């Protein structure tokens, strides 16, 4: 099993996609916990197809990060005690009897916002996409915060 949260979820799926065939066969499941997707090119070859049925995505009901970029897998939506972007913190995800409390789906307004953001991102040339992501992380880094709670307090 390979698992990760946020960028770690993206990296788990990416590593499994490009692993050697022998390694891919040994991976039983890939879990991406509110991890972003990929650019469409990742899905074009056979590499991703070899693992697709083993990829499990778990997202909070107001997910932003996990809905970024292209995603082909179905996803499970869970309840969260967080509000907005704070739902990205997996410690806010609701658990009952050792299992995630399931939500019906991603909120409709969040889906619309995610679609608009993704449409915009996909219009950018590769260099500008990279610059956007790097700048976003630099801005967050400059705040000096280390948790989403701290981030929301200073926002």
Language-model segment annotations:
Residues 1, 19-155:
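Alpha/beta hydrolase fold serine-hydrolase catalytic domain that processes acyl esters and thioesters
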Residues 3-8, 12:
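Gly/Ala-rich beta-loop-alpha elbow adjacent to hydrolase catalytic centers
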Residues 12-13, 42:
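Short glycine-/acidic-enriched loop or helix-start segments at secondary-structure transitions
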Residues 14-18:
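Active-site signature of alpha/beta-hydrolase-fold catalytic machinery across serine-
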């Amino acid at each position: 099993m390979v698992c990760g949260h946020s960028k770690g979820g993206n990296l788990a799926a990416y590593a499994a996609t490009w692993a050697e065939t022998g390694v891919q066969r040994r991976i039983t499941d890939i879990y991406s916990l509110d991890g972003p997707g990929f650019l469409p090119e990742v899905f074009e070859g056979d590499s991703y197809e070899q693992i697709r049925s083993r990829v499990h995505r778990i997202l909070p009901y107001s997910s932003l990060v996990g809905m970024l970029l292209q995603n082909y897998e179905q996803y499970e939506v869970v309840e969260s005690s967080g509000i907005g972007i704070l739902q990205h913190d997996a410690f806010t995800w609701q658990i009952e009897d050792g299992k995630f409390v399931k939500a019906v789906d991603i909120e409709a307004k969040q889906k619309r916002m995610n679609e608009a953001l993704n449409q915009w991102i996909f219009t950018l040339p590769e260099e500008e996409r990279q610059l956007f992501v790097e700048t976003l992380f630099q801005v967050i880094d400059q705040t000096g915060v280390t948790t989403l709670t701290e981030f929301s307090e200073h926002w």
